[in-house]
Amino acid sequence: MRADENNTLDLNNLPDDPSRDIFPFFEEGFSSSSSSGGFREKQTKDGKEYECRFCSLKFFKSQALGGHMNRHRQERETESLNKARELVLRNDSFPPHQGPPSFSYHQGDVHIGDLTQFKPMMYPPRHFSLPGSSSILQLQPPYLYPPLSSPFPQHNTNIGNNGTRHQTLTNSVCGGRALPDSSYTFIGAPVANGSRVAPHLPPHHGL
């Protein structure tokens, strides 16, 4: 039985026009379908017409359209490579930003920017007892920065205790800070038996 001459499935049925391609060649990623490919296929009076969806160029041969699509693909690949190179160069040229050195470090209990270290230092109060008395006196701590001059003169007073002389402190000796009572005396370094006595002073010839 002979095959029908008009059967399009017959492989021996070649087209009359050699310029028309039945099996157009496209690169990977492109399809001959107008819905999924990168072109539009239209049927015209002169034959099939292929239009590029990227630049709207029209081609009458599928091979010409395939080469045109290859150029679009190469352009996209080149653009992607250029962007990747720019990103790498940007990361190499500009390292991660490091903030300025912090001034919040501390050495011991002193913090930079804290003005507490510049406050006047006050000496702790000293408790002592007079010889032959059970009362305890407290010497008020002086200021760290005494005034230039004192309005009160300095006096030397004898306190009778086995011939020991004691020097009375006035406001000038305490750095300008007024004492609650003028009878407070300056006592020297501690000695044995837990009592404090004044250091020996040279005899006073004025009295």
UniProtKB/Swiss-Prot annotation:
Subcellular localization, as worded in the UniProt entry: Nucleus
Molecular function terms, GO-annotated: DNA-binding transcription factor activity; zinc ion binding
Record's compositionally biased regions (Low complexity): 1-16
Zinc finger (C2H2-type): 50-72
InterPro entries: JAGGED/SL1-like, Znf_C2H2_sf, Znf_C2H2_type
Tissue: Expressed in the emerging leaf, stamen and carpel primordia. Not expressed in the apical shoot meristem (SAM).
Region named Disordered: 1-20
UniProt keyword list: Developmental protein, Differentiation, Metal-binding, Nucleus, Zinc, Zinc-finger
The protein's name in its UniProt record: Zinc finger protein JAGGED-like
Native source species: Arabidopsis thaliana
